[in-house]
């Protein structure tokens, strides 16, 4: 984790949004960013605005899921928290949680860019190394 980071929050709210709807949203984003289907896994996590909440990982594209220093040798990289929106969040938006549901994600953009371009160290994005930074013009 870095002191400064960039994130993108997304949520969908409707009358029949489910965990499956959230997975479709995640897969669609990944397919648009990477141009292919990406293996995703969900681990239980706690976030006060979701119920249930998940840590969402993607297969490490630097090593193809085989394990490397980028993914801590386990083949996966954590890219976002997310989950089904907590009923209290819906209530605060004047939505009846008996009628409305939603799914929320918070994408770590630095990590997606790392995977998209095969960058092996997130700290490079915040460095003053112009040789590295200028390749993203």
PLM region descriptions:
Residues 1-137:
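TRNA-recognition modules of translation machinery and tRNA-sensing kinases, especially anticodon-binding
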């Amino acid at each position: 984790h870095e002191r400064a980071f960039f994130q993108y929050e997304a949520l969908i709210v409707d009358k029949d949004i489910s965990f499956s709807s959230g997975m479709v949203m995640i897969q669609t984003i990944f397919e648009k960013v990477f141009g292919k289907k990406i293996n995703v896994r969900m681990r239980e996590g706690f976030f006060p605005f979701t119920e249930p909440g998940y840590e969402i990982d993607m297969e490490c594209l630097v090593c193809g899921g085989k394990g490397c220093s980028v993914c801590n040798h386990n083949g996966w990289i954590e890219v976002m928290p997310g989950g089904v929106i907590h009923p209290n969040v819906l209530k605060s938006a004047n939505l009846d949680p008996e009628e409305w549901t939603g799914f929320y994600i918070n994408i770590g953009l630095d990590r997606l860019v790392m995977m998209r371009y095969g960058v092996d160290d997130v700290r490079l994005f915040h460095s003053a190394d112009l040789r590295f930074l200028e390749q993203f013009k």
